[in-house]
UniProtKB/Swiss-Prot annotation:
This is Zinc-finger homeodomain protein 12. Homo- and heterodimer with other ZFHD proteins. Interacts with ZHD11. It comes from Arabidopsis thaliana. The homeodomain differs form the typical one by having namely 4 instead of 3 extra amino acids inserted in the loop between helix 1 and helix 2. Residues 147-204 bind DNA. A zinc finger (ZF-HD dimerization-type) spans 37-88. GO terms for molecular function: DNA binding; protein homodimerization activity; zinc ion binding. Its main location: nucleus. The lineage of its organism: Eukaryota, Viridiplantae, Streptophyta, Embryophyta, Tracheophyta. Gene3D superfamilies: Homeodomain-like. It holds the Pfam family ZF-HD_dimer.
Amino acid sequence: MSSLSKPNRQFLSPTTNNQDTGREQTIACARDMVVLYNECLKNHAVSLGGHALDGCGEFTPKSTTILTDPPSLRCDACGCHRNFHRRSPSDGFSQHRSPPSPLQLQPLAPVPNLLLSLSSGFFGPSDQEVKNKFTVERDVRKTAMIKKHKRTKFTAEQKVKMRGFAERAGWKINGWDEKWVREFCSEVGIERKVLKVWIHNNKYFNNGRSRDTTSSMSLNLKL
C-alpha cells in the first residue's frame, strides 16, 4: 500500500511580504503624485489694473523644499508659491479611481516649454519690467486722452470776432489771402488751425441762427 503524500504547503516568506508592502507604498506614492502643478497663473500687474504672467510653464520645486513647510513650496523657476500654479487635475484625485497600473507609474515626460525656458535662462519678465511697461502704457493712454478731450476756451470777445470773420469769409478760410487770415489770428490771439476748427464746428450751427443777433454785435475787425 502506497503511502499518502502530504500536501505541499506554501508559506509566504518575509521577502514576499516586503514586496507586497513595497508595492502598496508605490501605489500610495503614485496616488499622491497624480496632482500636478502646471503653468504659473500669478498676475504680476494686478496693482496696475492689468494682467501679465511670467511665462513659467511648470512648477519646479527647489532643493530646499519641505512638504510640511508651506512657505518653502516655491517654484525654483519663477519664485512664486505653488498655489499660484494651475493644479491638474483641478478637481483633485478621485477616490473612486482604480489604483494606477505599472505603466502609469512611469515618470512623466518634461514639458518642452519649461526645458526651453531653463536652457535659455529666461523665465519671463521681472516684476519691475512688467511695472515699467504698464506705467509707460498708462502714461501714453493718459496723454492721448488729454489731447483728445482738450478744448480751447475762448473769451466772449474772441467768439464775436471769429463769428464776424467767418461770415465775411463765407465760413471758410481756404482760398482767401493767407496774410489776411494770419493777421486776424494774430489780432485775436489764436492759431490758424484753431480758427479753422472753430469755423468748421460752428458753421451749420450759426447758419441756423438769426442774423439780427450777429449784426447787433460790434465786430471791431481791422480787416
